[in-house]
């Protein structure tokens, strides 16, 4: 698959096996996995890190296969969960880092362009999350308030 702002191809990777049910060797119950998800998220892990930790430490092949729900859905049912989607937060953090870099290095044209591309991705994601109802319609990204928004 191609990248968004370049003509290069993306990274190659192996595809996941298509299966709807967990493998026969997996013995944990659905409730146990959900408790582990909430516990792991409570230890300052992001939603993607939760899946990796459960895979590596506890041998959970795929949380969605076992529980029938995604990690964010499990967290929202239990009253926790991220206020903003993880991919949006990561892009905003990248934009903040680029802003700080450009404050010190005004003439760095390559990173000025990288900041423009990153903020374009943020705006595109915000538009998508407005349409799907994940973010409220009055939520707006602004570089000036981004650092305050992420620190909360």
From Swiss-Prot:
Residues 1-19 have a biased composition (Basic residues). SMART domains: Ribosomal_S13_N, Ribosomal_S15. GO terms for molecular function: small ribosomal subunit rRNA binding; structural constituent of ribosome. Pfam families: Ribosomal_S13_N, Ribosomal_S15. Keywords: Ribonucleoprotein, Ribosomal protein. Coiled coil: none annotated. The keyword Chaperone does not apply. InterPro entries: Ribosomal_uS15, Ribosomal_uS15_arc_euk, Ribosomal_uS15_N, uS15_NS1_RNA-bd_sf. PROSITE patterns: RIBOSOMAL_S15. Residues 1-21 are annotated as: Disordered. Belongs to the universal ribosomal protein uS15 family. Part of the 30S ribosomal subunit. This is Small ribosomal subunit protein uS15.
